[in-house]
Regions:
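Acidic, proline/glycine-rich low-complexity IDRs
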Residues: 1-219
Length: 219
């Protein structure tokens, strides 16, 4: 697309090329599926002075039995001529999360968790890359849950590949829950992240977060 073509399209107030690009990428994995979408309150969004940096979340039903959550807000979503032709679209990634859940309401906590990660990145200006990990201060990543999953590990999404957009590269960074024991071992030796991912994939190829998991994959 040329800059002239972009300017013409941008005359439409609803033009959101970044948003459309994300949906198109997921349509490859989930053809003809209409995901459940949750938008954040306009007044709460950072662009209007609020603290919400994620504008919305979509939840897809995977044929493999899990819910697949994607954020909208870590990359450039709307018409912005200054962002046109960039190397990376804003932070260069959107966040994903996979969860075994019966209903979309069961995914609300995960969306809130991703929202907090978004706030962390925007406020601290500290982004995530595959292999990065973070503790939830030793507490379950789902508030109030009886779970050994107290930290997260970032990986490339196991199902949806990154894309090149008019604003630059957009990767899909998946977060998977890990135990306190695994987190402590990664702190001692971050290079073990690759071993952990490979071990987890043997039982869980899509790296779906299981809050009931007690097994440690690093010993």
């Amino acid at each position: 697309m040329t800059i002239e073509e972009f300017r013409e399209k941008a005359k439409d107030e609803e033009y959101a090329p970044g948003w459309d690009a994300i949906e198109d990428a997921f349509a490859v994995c989930y053809p003809e599926q209409n995901p459940n979408h949750y938008g954040t309150n306009f007044e709460a969004r950072a662009m209007f002075g609020g603290s919400e940096y994620i504008d919305g979340y979509s939840i897809y039903q995977s044929p493999h039995g899990h819910k697949h959550i994607i954020t909208f807000g870590m990359t450039e979503l709307y018409a912005d001529e200054e962002a046109f032709g960039g190397k990376y679209s804003r932070w260069g990634y959107e966040m994903t999360f996979k969860l075994k859940a019966d209903t979309t309401d069961d995914c609300m906590w995960a969306m809130n968790f991703l929202g907090n990660l978004g706030i962390y990145t925007y406020v601290k200006e500290s982004w995530f890359e595959p292999g990065h990990f973070m503790s939830n201060m030793g507490k379950p990543i789902k508030t109030g849950a009886d779970s050994m999953i107290t930290a997260i590990l970032a990986v490339d999404d196991t199902e949806v590949s990154g894309i090149d957009t008019i604003y630059g590269r957009v990767d899909f960074l998946q977060f998977v829950g890990i135990t306190s024991e695994e987190y402590e071992m990664l702190k001692e030796d971050p290079s073990k992240a690759k071993l952990l991912i490979e071990a987890m994939k043997k039982d869980n190829p899509y790296l779906v977060t299981d809050l009931g998991r007690k097994k440690s994959y690093l010993v």
